[in-house]
Amino acid sequence: MIIRQARSTEIRTLAALGVIAWEQAFAAAGEVTNHLREKAEATYFGFCEQYWPIIIAAEIDGETVGWAALEPGQNKITDVWVLPNFQRHGIGTALLSELEQQAVSREFDEVFLETHAKNTPALSFFKKHEYTISGLKSAYSPTMDKSVDTLEMRKRFN
């Protein structure tokens, strides 16, 4: 596995990967509809098109299988996505570790993120990596096209 900077030539691939992983995460909660899928596709493409220089990608045998991003100049993790068939193989852990190293190199003493309160696999993943819940909020989500409950999670570095 290689963790590397994303390339401008793979914006569509990154966006599609994000949508596939998003669908898998929310299908179990009955949250995915064709309308939401279209909104998710537009949201992910827009994000990847604008922010590809800050995205890191995980590659296995020449295939991009995951990506993640840390907000520029901040300590907020915006995304961690891994294709469903490649989950539970250490890819998310490698991406998360790289983002944490970036935050430390920027002299931050912690990182934080927000995740959908019903995204049980994500909550378990981040708890496993020593993230703790630090807040709950309800806000409009462009991807979900409604107000959703999100949990803020933090990890402090010693």
PLM segments and residue spans:
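Extreme N-terminal starter segment of soluble prokaryotic enzymes
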Residues: M1-I3
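Conserved glycine-rich acetyl-CoA-binding loop
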Residues: E63, D79, L83-S97, V104-R106, ...
